[in-house]
Amino acid sequence: MTYIPQIPIEDLVYVEFKDHETSSTPAYVRHLKEELNRVCKDGNLNRTKHIIVFQSTSGILRVKGTLWMVGKEYVLLKQNVHIPISSIIAVQ
């Protein structure tokens, strides 16, 4: 298993996001949206924190937090922090 650095949610404002190479395949996007909606529901109902793995210009990173909303192009975490869906690799 490869080590993926975890950053504090507050540091996401300094991250430059990059599209993940599989973000354009329809099957991947559909599956990812289903997972994001499941995690969002869990976060809103149970205040559960999940790990979001994403692509940045400096490499693959992860952040742990509660997902509050899933939009068309972005997800919203606490403190009005957004991550582009096209950068997200996985949600755990």
Regions found by a protein language model. Give the residues of each.
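Short hydrophobic/aromatic-rich beta-strand segments that constitute the beta-sheet cores
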Residues: 76-77, 91
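Short glycine-rich, low-complexity segments
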Residues: 1-60, 82-85, 90-92
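Short, conserved beta-turn/loop elements at beta-strand boundaries and strand-helix junctions
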Residues: 69-75
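Beta-strand residues in well-ordered beta-sheet regions across diverse protein folds
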Residues: 64, 77-78
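Short beta-strand-centered aromatic/proline hotspots
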Residues: 61-69
